[in-house]
């Protein structure tokens, strides 16, 4: 991804449609503490898309070489995407944050309990998410 001429698509909400994916590319590029890596990576970005759907579209339309995204995209679109794992030293791990209001109804509480169950973990794994 740092070699000149590689075409990369990234998700960048620009304050409009920020998601957990916004800026992840900077975490990957700068993970080893080298500003030169961030600079080289930045020079290869051809699209800063707002949201993963727009990123997917841009990746296809630009005939890009790489798209920094979450594991569910290549799993659910394996007819057009290939997942390529990056070096372990650059891997970024994110959690799924869930907040339950003190006034939440019982169904919300049940759903949260379900999310941490073995059954839910098996479902999440089918989309590439691990706990």
Name each region found by the language model.
Residues 2-131:
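Exported/periplasmic ABC-transporter solute-binding proteins
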């Amino acid at each position: 991804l740092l070699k000149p001429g590689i075409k990369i698509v990234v998700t960048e909400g620009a304050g409009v449609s920020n998601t957990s994916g916004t800026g992840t590319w900077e975490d990957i590029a700068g993970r080893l503490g080298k500003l030169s890596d961030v600079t080289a990576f930045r020079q290869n970005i051809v699209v800063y898309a707002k949201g993963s759907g727009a990123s997917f579209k841009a990746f296809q339309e630009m005939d890009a070489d790489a798209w920094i995204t979450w594991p569910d995209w290549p799993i659910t679109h394996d007819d057009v995407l290939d997942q390529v794992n990056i070096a372990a030293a650059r891997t970024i791990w994110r959690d799924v944050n869930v907040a339950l209001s003190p006034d939440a109804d019982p169904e919300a509480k049940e759903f949260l309990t379900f999310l941490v169950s073995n059954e839910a973990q098996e479902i999440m794994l089918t989309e590439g998410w691990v706990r």
